[in-house]
């Protein structure tokens, strides 16, 4: 990797990625030289203008991998965040000096560096344990067993692969191979659907598992393991499949193989193959991989049980649950958006489920449902509900850092293809390939598009992200997420100037010290708390809090200078909805979707008719604000830029003037105020 790294530095390519850290494999000199040669060719052409046709067959595999990687990391912050996670996952191994000069060195020195052959070429444990008579030295104890590295894993379900052509299957297999190279082991569960009897489904599942295995094996430096006896059914719990052997499941994953599993379980009392639902297989595998499948003895010490579970959880980290369904992500039937880009389960699960159920039961839905008595035709909304519920059930068993992705095999396959060079193109600028949602999410832990982007911005970015004919992204990123608190609750009481709440920041329902800490951490400045309370307490419109004060927004009703707050309708009509503070803890910035969660709540639930705010002209966050606002205005003779989401604001000169005067007149409340603008 040193060769590749030096190649990047020599060419002065701003690629945002430290490949020395990203490619977490130990390479021998020949492989490293091969990478250097291929990557020099890649960089000499320019990362965004090369295509598969530019490379020899020997170069293509490596160039494909790096091109996909370069394209999927869109910002330095995202790349650095991934590198930090990768570094934490794989701490440097302690170097130990050899204690003997000839006993084992003569065997291991001839092996390629980075190849772990276990005990194949070394002495077995029985040899070490055997008594040995030595003449020249004191007997050495057997070598201590080093703890295994934590396995980072993605659990993937592919629905009805029998309906997908070979091009799509090969594209999915290519992506799985790339994920594996990036340090994410993959376990694939085949879902044959429900169209057929048990025997037919079992046959289809086995055939498709073998088909996917063959496609994976066809990828360069990739190997699959088709496991057909992973799950079992106990007579005591016939409805709950369990993993028959944890070791048999994890060993091929640790060896870098992509495991493929059919939803077939074997009964324990009388060996018999039973077809189970793919969802049950996913839940059983999740429970095992999360360390929750152990059934302790009722008489066992609880502390000992906890220690055993903790040990299992240190072995494996189930980071991603990926559902590949031809229908794609979860659709949205409210608002301008057509699909949910990001779902915060803690906040949105019930609402989205009820929305899908409502549409399913409506006359419009029944009118479009296929008829004709075919009992095997599935309702698309039923499948979306199924994907939503499965994501909820799985993430409930996993740490909050784990996430889910619901997308289509077609989108994954399309983004895995290299755009072909067009002979008629004379421009030096090539078509940028579509970002792969799975690789992008691995690098960034975020969806392809921000969920707080307005619909017009999403469409524009989709057009820019792919080729001219690329369809809009329909991938849903799912997190267990965090609860969201809105005070007062806009579902109970709409936020309007006429019914302003009698609310203050020192209200018992608000943890003021944590709120102050959130603001000071986000802005990196000390707040003059009393001065701030004096300014906003009589003007509060409400408060939004994400999680345990990981993010939040303070919103007020402001009057332009010279307008008296006398409670009259004329005075209330002039009140401006104002975002006074928008804060996210530093540790939650750039990942986790905290800012999107708070912003969405503000513009969709609290102030759907519009809100305004201001920001320093040189604030690096302004790009984020620009993308989410309806309009902006640089305030002359100040260092402020005004933003708003209010439709048609510029058409109402009086309203626009009120917004501008409010943004000009607000005084900051910082304890370290030195006259520099906020």
Swiss-Prot record:
Residues 86-111 are annotated as: Disordered. It comes from Aspergillus oryzae (strain ATCC 42149 / RIB 40) (Yellow koji mold). Residues 499-668 form the N-acetyltransferase domain. Pathway: Amino-acid biosynthesis; L-arginine biosynthesis; N(2)-acetyl-L-ornithine from L-glutamate: step 1/4. This is Amino-acid acetyltransferase, mitochondrial. Keywords: Acyltransferase, Amino-acid biosynthesis, Mitochondrion, Transferase, Transit peptide. Its EC number is 2.3.1.1. N-acetylglutamate synthase involved in arginine biosynthesis.
């Amino acid at each position: 990797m040193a060769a590749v790294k030096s190649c990047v530095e020599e060419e002065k390519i701003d690629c945002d990625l430290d490949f020395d850290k990203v490619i977490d494999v130990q390479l021998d000199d020949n492989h490293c030289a091969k990478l250097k040669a291929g990557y020099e060719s890649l960089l000499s052409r320019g990362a965004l203008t090369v295509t598969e046709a530019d490379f020899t067959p020997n170069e293509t595999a490596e160039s494909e991998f790096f091109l996909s990687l370069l394209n999927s990391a869109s910002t330095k912050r995202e790349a650095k965040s991934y590198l930090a996670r990768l570094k934490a996952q794989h701490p440097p191994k302690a170097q130990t000096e050899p204690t003997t000069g000839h006993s084992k060195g003569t065997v291991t020195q001839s092996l390629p560096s980075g190849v772990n052959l276990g005990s194949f070429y070394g002495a077995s444990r029985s040899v070490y344990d055997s008594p040995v008579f030595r003449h020249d030295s004191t007997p050495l104890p057997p070598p201590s067993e080093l703890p295994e590295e934590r396995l980072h894993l993605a659990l993937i379900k592919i629905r009805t692969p029998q309906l997908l052509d070979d091009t799509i299957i090969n594209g999915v297999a290519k992506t799985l191979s790339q994920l594996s190279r990036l340090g994410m082991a993959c376990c694939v569960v085949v879902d044959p659907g429900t169209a057929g009897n048990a025997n037919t489904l079992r046959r289809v599942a086995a055939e498709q598992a073998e088909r996917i295995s063959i496609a994976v094996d066809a990828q360069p430096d990739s190997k699959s393991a088709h496991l057909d006896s992973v799950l079992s059914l106990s007579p005591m719990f016939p409805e709950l499949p369990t993993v028959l052997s944890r070791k048999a499941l994890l060993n091929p994953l640790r060896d870098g193989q992509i495991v493929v599993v059919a939803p077939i379980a074997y009964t324990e009392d009388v060996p018999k193959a039973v077809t189970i639902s793919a969802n049950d297989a996913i839940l059983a595998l999740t429970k095992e991989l999360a360390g929750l499948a152990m059934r302790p003895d009722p008489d066992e010490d609880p502390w000992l049980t906890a220690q055993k579970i903790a040990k299992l959880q240190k072995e494996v980290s189930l980071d991603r649950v990926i559902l590949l369904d031809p229908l794609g992500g979860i659709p949205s039937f409210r608002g301008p958006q057509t699909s949910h880009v990001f779902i915060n389960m803690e906040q949105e699960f019930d609402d989205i489920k009820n929305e899908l159920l409502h549409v399913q039961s409506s006359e419009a839905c029944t009118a479009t449902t296929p008829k004709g008595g075919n009992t095997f035709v599935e309702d698309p909304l039923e499948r979306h509900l199924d994907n939503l519920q499965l994501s909820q059930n799985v993430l409930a068993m996993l740490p909050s850092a784990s996430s889910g992705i619901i997308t289509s095999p077609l989108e994954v396959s399309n983004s895995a293809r290299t755009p072909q060079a067009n002979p008629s193109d004379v421009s030096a600028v090539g078509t940028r390939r579509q970002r792969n949602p799975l690789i992008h999410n691995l690098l960034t832990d975020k969806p392809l598009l921000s969920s707080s982007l307005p619909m017009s911005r999403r469409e524009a970015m989709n057009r820019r992200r792919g080729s001219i004919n690329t369809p809009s992204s329909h991938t849903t990123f799912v997190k267990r997420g965090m609860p969201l608190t809105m005070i007062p609750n806009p579902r109970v009481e709409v936020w309007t100037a006429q019914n302003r709440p009698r609310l203050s920041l020192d209200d018992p329902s608000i943890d003021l010290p944590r709120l102050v800490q959130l603001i000071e951490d986000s802005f990196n400045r000390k707040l003059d708390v009393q001065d701030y309370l004096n300014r906003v307490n009589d003007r509060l419109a409400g408060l939004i809090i994400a999680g345990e004060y990981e993010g939040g927004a303070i919103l007020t009703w402001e009057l332009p200078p010279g307008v008296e707050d006398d409670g009259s309708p004329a005075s209330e009509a002039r009140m401006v909805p104002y975002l006074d503070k928008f804060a996210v803890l530093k540790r939650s910035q750039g990942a986790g979707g905290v800012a999107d969660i708070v912003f969405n709540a503000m513009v969709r639930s609290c102030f759907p008719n519009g809100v305004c705010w201001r920001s320093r002209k040189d604030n690096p966050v302004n790009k984020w604000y620009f993308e989410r606002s309806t309009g902006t205005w640089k305030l002359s003779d100040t260092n402020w830029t005004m933003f708003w989401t209010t439709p048609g604001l510029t058409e109402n000169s009086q309203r626009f003037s009120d917004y501008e005067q409010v943004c000009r007149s607000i005084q900051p409340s910082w304890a370290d105020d030195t006259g520099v603008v906020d």
